[in-house]
Structures are given as C-alpha cells and as structure tokens.
Amino acid sequence: MAQITFKQEPITLLGSQVKTGETAPEFTLLDNDLNEVNLSTYDGQKKLISVVPSIDTGVCDQQTRKFNEEASQEDGVVLTVSVDLPFAQKRWCASNGLDNVITLSDHKDLSFGKNYGVVMEELRLLARSVFVLDKNNKVVYSEIVSEGTDFPDFESALEAYRNI
C-alpha cells in the first residue's frame, strides 16, 4: 500500500498501483444515466483517464476542464472518474455547459479505485491521478499525485496522450 497526503495529512491508498507498461485492469463504472460502463466499452480507442476526488471542488473542476479542452482535439476519449453520484456528475456537466465531458462514477463498489490502486482509505474517495492508455489498453502514462490537492502534471499526461 502506498501513501500520499491530502491537505498535508497522510493517506493510505488501497489496491495495487497501475504502472506504465502494464495492461490496464478492467473496471465497472456508472455513467450519468446509471448505465454500467467497462474499460472494454472503449476498446480500440486511446484513453486519457482523469481521476478526481470530487468533481465539485475547484482543483477537480479545473483538472476536468483542462484535460477535456486539450485532449478532446485528439482522436480518442477522455474519461473523468470520481466517486460522486452520477446525478451530481450530470448536474455539474449541465451547470457548466459541458455536454461532451464523459464523467463516470465509482461510488457503487470502488472497482476502478481498487483495481488502479487509488482508493484513499481514510476518505473513501479516489486519489487525484491520471492514466493514459493506448488502443490496446496498455498503460503508457501513470501518475498518482502525491498531494491530493495539487494538480497533476498536465503537460506530461497530454504529451503521452498525443504521442499514441
């Protein structure tokens, strides 16, 4: 188990961290209409998976906007994952006029968080992280932000995404 901090407090991450070069593990998430979505839903597409603790916070909001603005110009898909309820994710998208943002919820069973090693045990939230997968689901970039209130390395993640 790895440790990070959140607001400078130590946090334990559950699960096995996904590393560059590995095949990404499967997951089951809920979309905004409560439909189950799996990694295989996006087979044949490159993927930028942006993981945030809660979509309604300032840093998470900015992270979601930045990745969608920058990466949506590429051929692929950008997924934002949090444990927010699908209704809250849908409301956030609607209130911000962002119809093209794909938000997915891991609130049901934390399968994504456990499989990717990003469940913050003490908070039952997901650690801020970014995973870039090629069309065959090979992990080409993986970052778990060491302080949960900091931004990820946008440029490195976007460069990895563009270079697929």
Curated annotation (Swiss-Prot):
The keyword Cytoplasm does not apply. It comes from the Bacteria. It catalyses: a hydroperoxide + [thioredoxin]-dithiol = an alcohol + [thioredoxin]-disulfide + H2O. The active site is at 60 (cysteine sulfenic acid (-soh) intermediate). Its EC number is 1.11.1.24. Disulfide bonds join 60-93. It is an enzyme of class 1 (oxidoreductase). The keyword Disulfide bond applies. Residues 18-163 form the Thioredoxin domain. It holds the Pfam family Redoxin. One of its GO terms (molecular function) is thioredoxin peroxidase activity. Keywords: Antioxidant, Disulfide bond, Oxidoreductase, Peroxidase, Redox-active center. SUPFAM superfamilies: Thioredoxin-like. Homodimer. Belongs to the peroxiredoxin family. Tpx subfamily. PANTHER family: THIOL PEROXIDASE. NCBIfam families: PRK00522.1. Thiol-specific peroxidase that catalyzes the reduction of hydrogen peroxide and organic hydroperoxides to water and alcohols, respectively. Plays a role in cell protection against oxidative stress by detoxifying peroxides. The active site is a conserved redox-active cysteine residue, the peroxidatic cysteine (C(P)), which makes the nucleophilic attack on the peroxide substrate. The peroxide oxidizes the C(P)-SH to cysteine sulfenic acid (C(P)-SOH), which then reacts with another cysteine residue, the resolving cysteine (C(R)), to form a disulfide bridge. The disulfide is subsequently reduced by an appropriate electron donor to complete the catalytic cycle. In this atypical 2-Cys peroxiredoxin, C(R) is present in the same subunit to form an intramolecular disulfide. This is Thiol peroxidase. It comes from Staphylococcus saprophyticus subsp. saprophyticus (strain ATCC 15305 / DSM 20229 / NCIMB 8711 / NCTC 7292 / S-41). The gene is tpx.
